[in-house]
């Protein structure tokens, strides 16, 4: 499946430690709700602002909360037609789409769907962790959603990076340092193999109720992890 060459960079309202990289011309930057304030602090103007604005006051846009009602849940952007019918306005001259706060998709996932609809395949989630543990876990699930769609997703913490892989392998250069963990996001991950790390693992099964894959280490050699069947979270030091 082909897609756009650039990255879809989504900045949320969670803990923000600055941008891990500067957006390139071909990248598409989306502010998820009050993530717009994080981008302003970094001096970056997004291509799009998306949110229900229950955490940020915007002139002409009223953010509210309300009781949850039953809504259809769609597995892909093409079927999630609501993203084509969002209320449109502008915030400081930037295109803005307003989401009904009574919804199943959190703002970050809505941004991902829009990026998918735009043709992007690489998603970088910044400001997606913090004091709301439920939001942090939800963003890990967004990584799993992306992996199931055949996309690449990355969630940035202050010192660590998280990504999800599904039925594939990932190689790391010998320059990598620090800790490396592999945790099952699926009920089970079968055929997990880790080579070139401090602890060698061959064709094991990991499950999501036992943190067996915690705290391996890079050792200055090329390393590889693979999973034959399942969605695996990879967490590793990136600074």
Language-model features: locations:
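Short glycine-rich or small-residue beta-strand-to-loop segments that form or flank ligand, phosphate
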Residues: 97-98, 123-128
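Long, charged alpha-helical interface segments
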Residues: 160, 165-239
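Short phosphate-binding loop-to-helix
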Residues: 70, 74-92, 96-117
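Non-catalytic positions within long, well-ordered alpha-helices that form the structural scaffold/packing
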Residues: 40, 116-119
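Short, acidic/small-residue loops that bind anionic groups at enzyme active sites
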Residues: 145-162
